[in-house]
Design a protein with these regions (language model features):
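Short glycine-rich anion-binding loops that position phosphate/pyrophosphate groups of nucleotides
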Residues: 97, 222-224, 284, 417
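Hydrophobic residues in beta-strands of the RecA-like P-loop NTPase core, especially within AAA+ ATPase
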Residues: 172, 253-254
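Short strand-turn motif at the edge of the Rossmann-like AdoMet-binding core
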Residues: 222, 255-257, 282
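PLP-dependent aminotransferase class I/II
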Residues: 278-356, 362-363
């Protein structure tokens, strides 16, 4: 191993080259900061900065007194995977929608007229495009173009890849959607965590992230996962004013719960923004297996995405688009969405009420599938004790850009929660907290 360089960028690049060539294997230890600084004749802070960039890019990881080592393939948490649901545990961990509130995909695929396209055919179903344009036009008051991607995560990855390079800083919510953490780590981007409260991203935290050099912002306007927070009109205006001072920053709004959200959409993208996209996945209200998201974006951003989703290469299956179109145009599906909106709001609200009755405060009424509960005990210990009692939930640290954060929180998926379950779970969580308090004294 021969690390070279006199600047943080050069040192980090040297390590990356050796990792790519295989000279530095996963879990190989990097020299201590003091030792490498002496060998290279540079300040210790220069080496420390290089190592920090390697960690932020997912190339290396820190192990406390064990030093800094080359990272193995990232083991990233995902929705529904590794959620700790075993045996007879009640699943409040998966993050999934209620299957009974999803329409029949196979029936929709068989309806209407469908002609299998050949190479060179339009990449987007014309009728789906017409529907999407009308839907977006209700919320966007600036020129836009539409296209279809393989889901919201695919859209976010492609948008970041189209505008950013490895090592660029991206402002993301804290806590945030699991896939956002994975997208940044796998893409080699650095994260600038922006704290979230009941009204969404906090203006002071966004301002700090932009001052630190964030080149993109990923924001959830409503039904934020994991907290259930939604932007208020006032908060959206504050964020819009801040972003207006940074017109070149890429703004991605992930409106994943649009059709079944109980909250209105409040736009954070300012009129003068030159690079932006509004992404609306259909997974939460048409089904996770319908890998499709509708995207509205400025002309330049759309052109960059189209180059990566052109007919004949990586376009979204027209059969999937046909299925989505049939469902989105079906009045019966609209009625199902109205019912889903009502039931999801009722279930999450019921859980909040039952928790409050047990002395566990959730400071705002969430929207979406999940409820974020902050506790005054260790979240992992609470998750383990709840599992022993027959309840599966997810620990808060999984949703933090910095895994050391949100150690005292849990996320509870309330999508299928019944009233008896809400009552029982709240009592069990209160018992768990009391038991953990007693063992700590």
């Amino acid at each position: 191993m021969r690390i070279t360089g006199t600047t943080a960028a050069e040192i980090a690049g040297s390590v990356r080259d050796q990792v790519a060539s295989g000279e530095l294997a996963p879990r190989a230890s990097l020299p201590p900061v003091r030792v490498l600084a002496g060998e290279l004749g540079v300040n210790r802070n220069t080496v420390a900065l290089a190592y920090r960039r390697l960690v932020e890019a997912g190339v290396a990881e820190t192990r406390g007194r064990g030093g800094t080592v080359v990272a193995a393939v990232p083991q990233l948490a995902r929705e529904g995977v590794g959620a700790g649901v075993e045996g007879d545990c009640v699943d409040l961990a998966s993050g999934n929608p209620d299957p009974l509130l999803l329409p029949d995909l196979l029936g929709a695929a068989r309806r209407g007229e469908y002609s299998p396209p050949l190479y060179g055919a339009p990449a987007v179903d014309p009728e789906l495009d017409t529907w999407a344009r009308a839907d977006f036009a209700e919320d966007i008051d600036q020129p836009f173009r539409t296209l279809v991607t393989h889901g919201a995560v695919d859209a976010t990855e492609r948008l970041l890849n189209a505008h950013l390079t490895r090592g660029d800083l991206v402002a993301i919510e804290d806590p945030c959607f699991l896939a956002s953490i994975g997208t940044l780590r796998l893409g080699g981007y650095r994260s600038a965590p922006v704290r979230v409260d009941g009204a969404g991203m906090r203006p002071d935290a966004l301002r700090a992230a932009l001052a630190a050099g964030a080149r993109a912002v990923v924001c959830t306007p409503r039904a934020h996962n994991p907290t259930g927070a939604s932007l208020t009109e006032e908060r959206a205006a504050d964020l819009r004013a801040i972003l207006a001072r940074h017109p070149q920053v890429l703004v991605i709004e992930d409106d994943h719960f649009s059709a079944v959200s109980a909250r209105p959409y409040h736009r954070v993208t300012p009129p003068g923004s030159t690079r932006w996209a509004l992404v609306r996945s259909v997974s939460k209200f048409l089904g996770p297996d319908l890998r499709l998201a509708l995207v509205a974006a400025d002309a330049g951003t759309t052109a960059r995405l189209e180059a990566r989703l052109s007919a004949g290469t990586t376009w979204v299956s027209r059969l999937l688009q046909h299925t989505a179109r049939e469902l989105l145009l079906d009045p019966r599906v609209h009625e199902l969405h109205e019912r889903a909106r009502e039931l999801y709001a009722r279930r999450s609200g019921l859980l909040v009420e039952r928790l409050r009755a047990q002395g566990i405060e959730v400071p705002y009424r969430p929207d979406g599938l999940n409820v974020w509960v902050e506790l005054d005990v260790d979240g992992r210990a609470a998750v383990a004790d709840l599992a022993r009692r027959g309840w599966a939930v997810r620990p808060g640290h999984l949703f933090a850009p910095d895994p050391a954060a949100h150690q005292g929180a849990i996320r509870v998926t309330a999508a299928t929660l019944t009233e008896p379950q809400a009552e029982a779970f709240a009592a069990e969580l209160a018992a768990t907290v009391a038991e953990l308090h007693s063992t700590a004294t």
